[in-house]
Amino acid sequence: MIEVVLVTICLAVFPYQGSSIILESGNVNDYEVVYPRKVTALPKGAVQPKYEDAMQYELKVNGEPVVLHLEKNKELFSKDYSETHYSPDGRKITTNPSVEDHCYYRGRIENDADSTASISACNGLKGHFKLQGELYLIEPLELSDSEAHAVFKLENVEKEDEAPKMCGVTQNWESYEPIKKASDLNLNPDQQNLPQRYIELVVVADHRVFMKYNSDLNTIRTRVHEIVNFINGFYRSLNIHVSLTDLEIWSNEDQINIQSASSDTLNAFAEWRETDLLNRKSHDNAQLLTAIELDEETLGLAPLGTMCDPKLSIGIVQDHSPINLLMGVTMAHELGHNLGMEHDGKDCLRGASLCIMRPGLTKGRSYEFSADSMHYYERFLKQYKPQCILNKPLRIDPVSTPVSGNELLEAGEE
């Protein structure tokens, strides 16, 4: 018989209904303080890894016990994941950090078939989960008790700006036949049998983003990893695995002319991607994260139906919110345009969830792709047969102990 050791952390829950607190996600006016209890079954004497492949947490939400099951997102990084930044004199510095033992998870709530979760466990639990159709955010509290976390609804984060924020889209392809309303087709992901596809994504953070986060590469790295973990979760409903293959940070200066005129910035980014980035890093799509305020209340811009195009498989996204979930929705939206998805109606709902391809971003109970978006995507696959998203970006398992720095000896090396 295998003996197991139950590792438990924390016990209590203290709701502060009606209180207000400033968190990393913003000023929250209604939240609960919770102490998640971690339960891990390990063989007796086993060495506990820093980040386990599977974890289970117990906590209370609205006074009710909840069991959160988490599984490490092993699709999050491609086999050749790299990071690039620039020295003060402009030299490219590229590394291949080991990401095998990363701290990003996806999951579900026990006994809730419609639940989802995307969580970072790098420093406490941070992310979101959907429980009984409601979206909750969780993040650590900076208290003397290091196990304290805040749980709150997205709607309880105070709005910084009431002005409507919109997405731009450039028309770069035409349909050969009129699209039927997906509502008439009564489609869902299971019925459509959407084929498995894989997107190797590059995220580029401009110099304003670098300065916004106090020139801290680690802060930007963590933010982008959390955003892509959310994107990966959204696209699972379409049978698409989104893996981050490169993070580039323009730490010295911008490599293109970044302007508020979003279309000009998009065009400049397209030229740079084709003539520079693609020559040194194989990838399927690149998204520019910029801290400049784009024109006409635009949060992002992307060409329509351009996935796998060597120049136009791109998008730009304004770093508009401290809430990584909303940034994930925005970047997933722009990526959707690259996959042929047009805008949904401004009031589009999928059940109780807001549609990701709405033209404007608003806070909702949860976010999903609509049936129309699924049909647009399926039509794009049939008409254009994009080849770059067919290959699966498998992880390479190291076969030896680490050597100096982050380098690993791979199979065949000496």
Swiss-Prot record:
Residues 197-393 form the Peptidase M12B domain. InterPro entries: MetalloPept_cat_dom_sf, Peptidase_M12B, Peptidase_M12B_N, Reprolysin_adamalysin. The active site is at residue 334. It is found in: Secreted. It is an enzyme of class 3 (hydrolase). Ca(2+) 1 binds at residues 200, 284, 388, 391. CDD domains: ZnMc_adamalysin_II_like (cd04269). SUPFAM superfamilies: Metalloproteases ('zincins'), catalytic domain. Expressed by the venom gland. Its EC number is 3.4.24.42. One of its GO terms (biological process) is proteolysis. Monomer. This is Snake venom metalloproteinase atrolysin-C.
